[in-house]
């Protein structure tokens, strides 16, 4: 999680230098806690479990939203219903949510990896619309921070 946080903070600072309004501290905290739900499960459900843990701890709503919206390029309401999740928004909306979600896609263990590698791996388990959302997030982040990933 520390690697995700470090990359997310770099991205947030890059965004701020480009004139975007970004809460860098929120990005850092959200990135450090984005996988807190893995204490309960290592499945996709860790996003909802993490949001529950964060609520129980009394964390700010902005942090809770980062935790529950970081999975993939977001989870649609239809997908959330199929997963049995509470009705809510599970797609990153704010710049801080998008930064953490994207940074998470570029880190494997403690190493930075190319987005193509992440997408290739996720393509084995996710349907095409979910992969398309990750590509869309990637394209949006390229416009915000440029190419911040490692070489292939």
Model regions and ranges:
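Divalent metal-dependent phosphate-bond-processing catalytic cores, especially two-metal-ion Mg2+/Mn2+ enzymes
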Residues: 1-22, 33, 56-59, 78-152
């Amino acid at each position: 999680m520390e690697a995700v946080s470090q990359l997310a903070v770099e991205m947030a600072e890059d965004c701020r230098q480009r004139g975007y309004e970004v809460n860098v501290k929120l990005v850092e905290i959200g990135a450090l806690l984005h996988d807190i739900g893995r204490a309960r499960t290592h499945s996709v459900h860790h996003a909802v479990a993490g949001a529950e843990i964060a609520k129980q701890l009394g964390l700010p709503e902005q942090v809770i939203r980062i935790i529950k919206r970081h999975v993939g390029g977001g989870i649609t309401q239809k997908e959330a219903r199929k997963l049995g999740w509470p009705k809510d928004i599970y797609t990153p909306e704010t710049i801080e949510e998008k930064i953490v979600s994207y940074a998470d896609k570029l880190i494997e263990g403690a190493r930075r990896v190319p987005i193509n590698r992440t997408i290739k791996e996720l393509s084995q388990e996710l349907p095409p619309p979910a992969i398309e959302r990750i590509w869309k997030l990637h394209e949006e982040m390229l416009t915000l921070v440029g190419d911040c990933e490692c070489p292939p």
